[in-house]
Amino acid sequence: MALAEAPRPGPLMDPEWHGSPEGKEYLGCILRKKKRKFFGLIERPVLSPQLPADIASYKLFVCGRSGAGKTSFIAKLAGLEVPSMHHETTGIQTTCVYWPVRPTHSARPVIFRFQFWDCGEGALRKFDHILPACKEMADAVLFLFSFTDRSSFEDVPALISRTLGQEEDVARVVIGTKLDQYTHTDVTENDLRDFQRTWQLPVMRVRSVNGPRVAEGRGLDGRVGLVECAPVLNGLAEILWRRDQVIAGLVGGAD
């Protein structure tokens, strides 16, 4: 996974902290026997008294056309098995992902609680209440396209217009999925640069494939998976933390 160059300057979060000895200790709270821990809506990581941290909770609505890779994207970040076949999500599905980060000007880490909301395109069209429910109290909307489907990329501006009104003050992030299928890509780096220059939105790139498994083969290697997901999780943390700081008047917004 990789984060494309974004228009917002200056990191507020240390993007390399997760690889430090202290960062690895905190990562231990979301791992169990080399595998990822999975958390329900009311569960949270258990930290020892020697590992103080604050919790910052955010709701993220993941949207995109059918087959764009929404469910696979969330599964990748959560350490779940990436589905080998496409199945339309029925109704609304929520997934909690915890990620520890340390602000650049603080010695006290923050554990981000990302609550991802996903729903199938069919459900959105059939039930009028689904879209308002997904957007209610959302901090960010993630607009997904597939690198293997150029039309899904070209549809992103229209997708944004269909999903959000100009008055809706939420973070907007574009995610390109299926980066692992580079031999079939229909979207180039020049396309991404032109898009960012025009729309002034951050673009992230995601591999929609399972990472290595643990030695016995039963389950995915949680620590390796976290390293793969770190650029995107750090990127989302940076965007949401900066947004909060701008709203609070603690830092300036984008130029």
From Swiss-Prot:
Q: Name one GO biological process term.
A: protein transport
- Give one Pfam family: Ras
InterPro entries registered for this protein in UniProt: P-loop_NTPase, RSG1, Small_GTPase
Record's keyword annotation contains GTP-binding: yes
Q: Where in the cell is it found?
A: Cytoplasm, Cytoskeleton, Cilium basal body
Name the Gene Ontology molecular function terms of this record: GTP binding; GTPase activity
Give the record's keywords alphabetically: Cell projection, Cilium, Cilium biogenesis/degradation, Cytoplasm, Cytoskeleton, Exocytosis, GTP-binding, Nucleotide-binding, Protein transport, Transport
Residue ranges for the region (Small GTPase-like) are: 52-255
Q: Name the domain of life this protein comes from.
A: Eukaryota
Q: Which residues bind GTP?
A: G64, R65, S66, G67, A68, G69, K70, T71, T177, K178, L179, D180
The UniProt record lists the keyword Transport: yes
SUPFAM superfamilies the record matches: P-loop containing nucleoside triphosphate hydrolases
| Principal location class | cytoplasm
The job of this chain, per UniProt, is described as: Potential effector of the planar cell polarity signaling pathway. Plays a role in targeted membrane trafficking most probably at the level of vesicle fusion with membranes. Involved in cilium biogenesis by regulating the transport of cargo proteins to the basal body and to the apical tips of cilia. More generally involved in exocytosis in secretory cells.
Mind telling me what this protein is named? Answer: Ciliogenesis and planar polarity effector 2
Q: Which organism is this protein's natural source?
A: Xenopus tropicalis (Western clawed frog)
